[in-house]
């Protein structure tokens, strides 16, 4: 059975989703309110995680352990390293990496997560296709791109760092 977890770091990022869902239960875990219900006849759990990778990871683990979600959508605002993206455009993640992971002193590549043997985390192809189709159907005037998402607990403003990440 498909059950989708929808995460937003800030209330502003999830309030619209919550307003369209039929909520059957609200469960509080680790200070976060998980809204369980349906959205367009699909089982969903919507939650505001708080800002940062640690909060997102904690939230994701609760979604997996307590709610047994099969898929996760992380929604919200973000900065852009891509000059072709404007405010209001949509970027669908083809892959993701931690831009501030650095254990090169132990022989790993920049961004590589120890003992995982990789630094990129690939998106599910079916979810990519469905997300792009949904975006185009709902609002065909908004630019939609598929590309890399990088995550880090810092803001990147240095041009050389930006170029390395994209």
Where are these regions (language model features)?
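Glycine-rich phosphate- or other oxyanion-binding loops that anchor nucleotides, phosphorylated ligands
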Residues: 2-3, 27-166
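Short, conserved "active-site rim" segments that organize catalytic pockets and cofactor/ligand binding
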Residues: 2-21
